[in-house]
């Protein structure tokens, strides 16, 4: 039997879909799953008649692959990845390459790269975005590792990635754990996007009184605008058309429990931002919103005890309010992406990743969850100035916020007056106002620190560190 060009371990839905994508693009492959029943079911159904070979032991799996072997691992992050790597180590030869396509923590990837490098084996951490549909029809791929490792898989990843007007949605990210770092921040930005959209929905429903049909119309119209055209806005419009199929006749979205789950990448983004000193308040607000949503019973009890402001029904211009919410959403979105890109820029310096921020925006234009026309503007901003300190300083984004900030502020004020939480909208505006201020009140913070802890302070009128006798 001829040796296969590629190997894939892990046949959950993402693994199955990537296997089918790889085969459809002309590459033969062997698949393996820890449970033989899963492999048998895949071969009897979706892989039937395709150039895919099953293996029922890792020994047979490795023996079926041409050398140098290229093996994509699609298993749960953490211990399961380590277990697969440990099982593969004695079976592989120098020059073979393992690619982790899961949502692994970047520091785990850094460790695995070093461990396997000592054995002459390659290891790549590759972010894969796009969900089940993207895995099958073209995801956004973020491979990190050595340049040689990337070149070994480049023909395959370029073939299976989503294709946009300026090429496949994949690029060499950088060394070590950079691929998984970029995917982590991508997911953090995704958290921000989703929370901002949720807040816009809440405002339109709770203030303007829009029903599901009207909400569909608004989001569908927004999806046709250059600034908000995106996958997440598109699916939001679709969600409002879904009627419960259990006989209630109600919009399904209104019957879904308001307790959001999370798998950890948002929290990781927050943790690493704090570690390296980058402010990402919108993303932090999004993570906190999910945490607060999860304490449903506690919130229900609190709702019986803690009352908000008493307000009159909305009597303003409905369309004007809808337009203002759109402006607030877009301004907040700019700030959220500015935070994510600032985090990537700082991480690139700290970890020596050499990230190309414009290229990252390009590969997110297709296949991934945050794909949006707006990313073209981000790419153009970094192409025009690769050293751009913050997206807020790019001429187009600066002018957009200056033109729309009054509507943005008005929407947040209305939410506050009515007791409607808009943590991500508010955090975005606070970020903008803090970033544009020449002087912040942290001079008082420094005075306090020096008062109680003799931590010293710097002065505005002369250089050096100072300590005052406060008492």
Curated annotation (Swiss-Prot):
- Pathway noted in the entry: Carbohydrate degradation; pentose phosphate pathway; D-ribulose 5-phosphate from D-glucose 6-phosphate (oxidative stage): step 3/3
For this protein, the Enzyme Commission number is: 1.1.1.44
Ligand binding (substrate):
103, 129-131, 186-187, 191, 263, 290, 449, 455
Q: Fetch the InterPro entries from UniProt.
A: 6-PGluconate_DH-like_C_sf (IPR008927), 6PGD_dom2 (IPR013328), 6PGDH_C (IPR006114), 6PGDH_Gnd/GntZ (IPR006113), 6PGDH_NADP-bd (IPR006115), 6PGdom_BS (IPR006184), NAD(P)-bd_dom_sf (IPR036291), Pgluconate_DH (IPR006183)
The entry lists its GO molecular-function terms as: NADP binding; phosphogluconate dehydrogenase (decarboxylating) activity
Which Gene3D superfamilies does the entry link to?
Answer: 6-Phosphogluconate Dehydrogenase, domain 3, N-(1-d-carboxylethyl)-l-norvaline Dehydrogenase, domain 2, NAD(P)-binding Rossmann-like Domain
Which residues participate directly in catalysis? 183 (proton acceptor), 190 (proton donor)
Give the source's domain of life in one word.
Bacteria
Which keywords annotate this record?
A: Gluconate utilization, NADP, Oxidoreductase, Pentose shunt
Which residues are listed for NADP(+) binding in this entry?
A: 10-15, 33-35, 75-77, 103
What reactions does this protein catalyze? 6-phospho-D-gluconate + NADP(+) = D-ribulose 5-phosphate + CO2 + NADPH
Q: Which Pfam families match?
A: 6PGD, NAD_binding_2
Q: Which GO terms describe its biological process?
A: D-gluconate metabolic process; organic acid catabolic process; pentose-phosphate shunt
Binding partners and assembly: Homodimer.
Q: Which family does it belong to?
A: Belongs to the 6-phosphogluconate dehydrogenase family.
Q: What does this protein do?
A: Catalyzes the oxidative decarboxylation of 6-phosphogluconate to ribulose 5-phosphate and CO(2), with concomitant reduction of NADP to NADPH.
Its name, as the record gives it, is 6-phosphogluconate dehydrogenase, decarboxylating
Protein source organism: Synechococcus elongatus (strain ATCC 33912 / PCC 7942 / FACHB-805) (Anacystis nidulans R2)
Q: What lineage is on file?
A: Bacteria, Bacillati, Cyanobacteriota, Cyanophyceae, Synechococcales
Its gene name is: gnd
